[in-house]
UniProtKB/Swiss-Prot annotation:
GO terms for biological process: glutamate biosynthetic process; glutamine catabolic process. Gene3D superfamilies: DD-peptidase/beta-lactamase superfamily. Its EC number is 3.5.1.2. It catalyses: L-glutamine + H2O = L-glutamate + NH4(+). The gene is glsA2. Belongs to the glutaminase family. This is Glutaminase 2. Substrate binds at S89, N140, N191, Y215, Y267.
Length: 340
C-alpha cells in the first residue's frame, strides 16, 4: 500500500486525536519580544525591493512591521503593521485550504501534487520534470492549478469564492490593488505560459486564461502584517478566525495547508527556513511572510527588502528570533533533566 493510497480525512478509526501545541508566553512577554525583534532587525539594509511591477519598486525600503496574533485573539505588534501591500504568493496556502475544503484534501493532492520541486517559484521545468505535470500548490504552477479548481459556473463566481474566503481568513474586507493587477495582467507572460503547459498535462479545471486571471487577482489583494497574522492564526486555530470566531475551513484542512507550506512555502530555500525556524511559513515578493505555530498563533511580517529567492530578509530574521524566544519551533523540546 502506497502512502498516497491511505485515507485522507480527520477520522482516526475511532481513536481520539491528541495534539501537542502548548501555548504562548504571557502577553507582556510576547509584546516585549516582538518589540525586541523589531528593534534588532529594523536597521538591516540587506536585500533589494522587488522590481517585478512598478508599484512594488516604489515601496519605501525601510518599512518593517511585525504582528503576532494568538489563537486567543490577543494582538501584539511593532512597527509598520498597518501598512498595506499586495499579498502576492502569501495567498497560496489560504486559497489551497479553500479548495481543499471544497473538493476534499485527497482529491486536491491527486490533482495538484504536494512534493517540493526544489526549483524557483516560477519554474516551467518543474512541470515537465514531473511525469504527470503535478508540482506543489506553493509554487506558481501548482497555485495556478489550485485556483483553476475553485468552484463556480463563471469566472465571477469563482472570484467571489476566492475573495470571500480570503476576507474571512483576514476577518475584514480586503481591497484589490488595481495598479498592481493591471500591471501584472500586462506582463504576466510567464504565468500564462505555465497555465498553457498545465493545460497540456490536463491539470487545469478551467480555461488557462481564466485561471491565470483569477490567480493574478488573488495575488493583487492588499493586506497588512496584521492581516497576515490573523490569517495565520486562523490556520493555527483549526480554521477558526480568532478575532471574528467564524469557522473558515475545517480543522483537518489546516493540517494539509500547513503541510504544503512546510514543503515549499519559501520555494527553493524552504529547507533552510525549516532548519532555522521550524515552522510552516509562506512568503511573497510584496515583502510579506506569514508563519504559523499550530495551536499558538500566527506571525505576520512585512519588510520589502528581499533576498535572491524573493523572500523578505527582515521577515526571516524576525521569524527566526521569535520562533525560539516564544517557544514556537516545532522541533525544539524541553531540555532533558535527570529525574529522581
Amino acid at each position: 500500500m502506497e502512502i498516497t493510497d491511505m485515507p485522507t480525512d480527520d477520522s482516526n478509526n475511532g481513536i481520539i486525536d491528541y495534539v501537542s501545541t502548548g501555548h504562548l508566553p504571557d502577553p507582556e512577554t510576547v509584546v516585549k519580544l516582538v518589540q525586541e525583534a523589531h528593534k534588532r532587525f529594523s536597521t538591516d539594509t540587506a536585500g533589494v525591493v522587488s522590481n517585478v511591477y512598478p508599484a512594488l519598486e516604489r515601496i519605501p525600503a525601510d518599512l518593517f512591521g511585525i504582528c503576532m496574533v494568538g489563537t486567543n485573539g490577543k494582538i501584539h505588534s511593532a512597527g509598520d503593521v498597518d501598512y498595506e501591500f499586495t499579498i502576492m504568493s502569501v495567498s497560496k496556502p489560504f486559497v489551497f485550504a479553500l479548495v481543499c475544503q471544497a473538493i476534499g484534501a485527497k482529491t486536491a493532492r491527486e490533482k495538484l501534487g504536494v512534493n517540493s520541486t526544489g526549483m524557483a517559484f516560477n519554474s516551467v521545468t518543474a512541470i515537465e520534470r514531473a511525469s504527470d505535470g503535478r508540482t506543489n500548490p506553493m509554487v506558481n504552477s501548482g497555485a495556478i492549478a489550485t485556483t483553476s479548481l475553485v468552484p463556480g459556473a463563471t469566472s465571477d463566481e469563482q472570484w467571489k469564492f476566492i475573495y470571500d474566503g480570503l476576507c474571512r481568513f483576514a476577518g475584514r474586507e480586503l481591497t484589490l490593488n488595481e495598479e498592481v493587477y493591471q500591471s501584472a495582467c500586462e506582463t504576466n507572460f510567464r504565468n500564462r505560459g505555465i497555465a498553457n503547459v498545465l493545460q497540456g498535462y490536463g491539470r487545469l479545471g478551467c480555461d488557462p486564461i481564466i485561471a491565470t486571471d483569477l490567480y493574478t487577482r488573488q495575488c493583487s489583494l492588499n493586506v497588512s502584517a496584521r492581516d497576515l497574522a490573523v490569517m495565520g492564526a486562523t490556520l493555527a486555530d483549526g480554521g477558526v478566525n480568532p478575532l471574528t470566531r467564524e469557522r473558515v475551513v475545517d480543522n483537518d484542512i489546516c493540517h494539509y495547508a500547513l503541510a504544503v507550506m512546510v514543503t515549499a512555502g519559501l520555494y527553493e530555500t524552504s529547507g533552510d527556513w525549516l532548519y532555522d525556524i521550524g515552522l510552516p511559513g509562506k512568503s511573497g515578493i510584496g515583502g510579506g511572510i506569514v508563519t504559523v505555530s499550530p495551536g499558538k498563533g500566527g506571525l505576520g511580517t512585512f519588510a520589502p527588502l528581499l533576498d535572491s529567492a524573493g523572500n523578505s530578509i527582515k521577515g526571516q530574521l524576525a521569524a527566526r528570533f521569535l520562533s525560539r524566544s516564544l517557544g514556537m519551533d516545532m522541533f525544539v523540546s524541553e531540555p532533558y533533566t535527570e529525574k529522581n
